[in-house]
Each structure stands twice: as C-alpha cells, then as structure tokens.
UniProtKB/Swiss-Prot annotation:
Binding residues annotated for ATP, in chain numbering: S9, F10, H17, G88, L89, R90, E98, Y122, S123, F124, L125, S126, S127, S128
The protein, known as: Phosphopantetheine adenylyltransferase
Recorded catalytic activity of this chain's protein: (R)-4'-phosphopantetheine + ATP + H(+) = 3'-dephospho-CoA + diphosphate
Cofactors: Mg(2+)
Site for Transition state stabilizer, residues: H17
Organism of origin: Acidothermus cellulolyticus (strain ATCC 43068 / DSM 8971 / 11B)
Main localization (coarse): cytoplasm
Any one Gene Ontology BP term: coenzyme A biosynthetic process
This protein's record includes keyword Endoplasmic reticulum: no
Its biological purpose: Reversibly transfers an adenylyl group from ATP to 4'-phosphopantetheine, yielding dephospho-CoA (dPCoA) and pyrophosphate.
Length: 165
C-alpha cells in the first residue's frame, strides 16, 4: 500500500489545503492528514475541532484518514510506515523553507517529500489570512468549506465559544 502524509496546523483548513489533499488522495492508496499539536502556538480552534473540520471536508475521500501529532513529523511517519510527506508550494518563498525541511526529514529518517504546486486560485491563501479577513467581517466563503465558515463565524463573533485546549 502506497502511503503519504499531508501535515499542517489546519487552523482552519482552507480550500488550498483541500486541493493538495484531494490531489494526494488521487496519487496514494492512503493519505493521512496529520494535524499538528503545538502547545507553544495559540490556535483559534482546538486540535479536536481542527480534526473534525478536516474530517468533514474530506469525507468524500475514503482513503483519507485524519490524526493529530506532536513532535517530529518523521517520528510520526516512521511509527505508521509512511515514506512520503506531501507539501503544497504557493510561492518560491515556500520552497526555500520547505526544501530545508525536506532535506532534514530525509537525513533523519529517509522520508521523502513530494512538492505539489498550489492551484493558482489558492496561491495567496493561508489560514492566517482567512482568520484575519474574517475577523474584520470580510467574505471568506470562497476560501474555506461552508462548514468551516460557520465554525469560524461562531468562534470569532461569539466570545463564549473559546476552544478547548
């Protein structure tokens, strides 16, 4: 079975993420979406909420599974027998950082990295940008799935709905 992982914080998952995940699902027998647990970074959504959003958004792909991870991604890969990391590249600036990470991951554990160029429709898109625009009342409906947009509006405009960290 050919396996790959698509890692990220997915806070929240965007249509750009989903483009990469769907393309990975077409290339591999099993794609694990690995949602990062980073206690040093304050996320808008808890890891459980982010995993739920990714599961909802990828429900049409039977070969996509969603898990969380902390620590080194290569340790996560090694424990699950995943030999390939899939990363989307939006711009040359992404490549500079991701190439270093790919080389380190290969050096540490022999894990390969496959770079997919982002669909030009999403080349500017990031979770941070979505959150910022939404916080100011901007329309992000074409950038994220509807279910994510509903959760985002609730989180941003209903202060009683803090994440469970």
């Amino acid at each position: 079975m050919r396996k790959a992982v698509c890692p990220g914080s997915f806070d929240p998952v965007t249509n750009g993420h989903l483009d990469i995940i769907s393309r990975a699902a077409a290339l591999y027998d099993e794609v694990t979406v690995a949602v990062l647990v980073n206690k040093a970074k304050r996320a808008l959504f808890s890891v459980e909420e982010r995993m739920d959003m990714v599961r909802e958004a990828t429900a049409q792909y039977p070969n996509v599974v969603v898990e969380s991870f902390s620590g080194l991604l290569v340790d996560f890969c090694r424990a699950r027998g995943i030999p390939v990391i899939i990363k989307g590249l939006r711009a040359v600036s992404d490549f500079d950082y991701e190439l270093q990470m790919a080389q380190m991951n290969h050096s540490l554990a022999g894990v390969e990295t496959l770079f997919l160029s982002t669909n030009p429709l999403y080349s500017f898109l990031s979770s941070s940008l979505v959150k910022e625009v939404a916080a100011y009342g901007g329309d992000v409906s074409t950038l994220i799935p509807d279910s994510v947009a509903r959760r985002l509006r609730t989180r941003l405009f209903d202060p009683s709905r803090e994440p469970d960290h």
